[in-house]
Amino acid sequence: MTEPLKPRIDFDGPLEVEQNPKFRAQQTFDENQAQNFAPATLDEAQEEEGQVEAVMDAALRPKRSLWRKMVMGGLALFGASVVGQGVQWTMNAWQTQDWVALGGCAAGALIIGAGVGSVVTEWRRLWRLRQRAHERDEARDLLHSHGTGKGRAFCEKLAQQAGIDQSHPALQRWYASIHETQNDREVVSLYAHLVQPVLDAQARREISRSAAESTLMIAVSPLALVDMAFIAWRNLRLINRIATLYGIELGYYSRLRLFKLVLLNIAFAGASELVREVGMDWMSQDLAARLSTRAAQGIGAGLLTARLGIKAMELCRPLPWIDDDKPRLGDFRRQLIGQVKETLQKGKTPSEK
């Protein structure tokens, strides 16, 4: 049985000719071009972030200078001399049965012991603050690693430092999501998306509340000196609370070091970021025409507090920012503007009545 013939098919266009890939011609550089050659620069944001990290690392590391070694050696020698003299006085007082001198030696020993204990405690807290930077570097390495076996232990250590209980729902979801076939990058990424946002949300609430209090205080208070003292106290308290949320216990010197790092981070990042995030939006809304001078100053103080909180959050956070989850000033700006407007409207309503 023969099959029927198929109808003829006519093509309007010409047949496509097979095109071979074209390669670029070979380029050679002479000696003058080689001398003037400049490699391509990285993205400005990445370069700025790398410079900031380098500055933070240099600030956290103590400078091993000759003068520092001489001062430390002198203090150690003085401490040994004080201890030796105290032991000699104690022995002489015991032999001569001078109970008053013996009591004075005991009191001096207690004072010296308390001083040494406080120094050791401050050193431990300062060391813990430095370790947080190393943990952040370790987390960054794990996020680019394809190995196995280190990610889970690292994340469990972070959860323990932050005080997250094993029965916490977020930690339970993380345990249910990981398995043995996942590498360290996947395990740490799951922790960053399931557990870390719990602490970040608490830090955001602290920043939002402190920024709102600073804004309203400046907007309604007529005393500039009181405003400055209040803002300074609130900013220090905000940094302490953020550090506590992320499992860092601050002492006197570690608190000063963290506050110095926050200010250094803000100064090094420059005012361009502040202008980029806030300036254009302020110009579009024409806030200068809508708000009073005190209200505008209050918003500025609130944004400064928010910026301090964001930088403190960045320095105390054990993980680097992933997928652009870093909080921005714009996240707090609308809330501050709305609160100031609401406060001004409440102040005008009784006077109108």
UniProtKB/Swiss-Prot annotation:
InterPro entries: DUF697, UPF0283. The keyword Hydrolase does not apply. Its main location: membrane. Pfam families: DUF697 (PF05128). Residues 1-69, 121-212 are periplasmic. Coiled coil: none annotated. It is a multi-pass membrane protein. Keywords: Cell inner membrane, Cell membrane, Membrane, Transmembrane, Transmembrane helix. Residues 91-99, 234-353 are cytoplasmic. GO terms for cellular component: plasma membrane. The chain crosses the membrane at residues 70-90, 100-120, 213-233. It is found in: Cell inner membrane. Belongs to the UPF0283 family. This is UPF0283 membrane protein YcjF. It comes from Escherichia coli O157:H7.
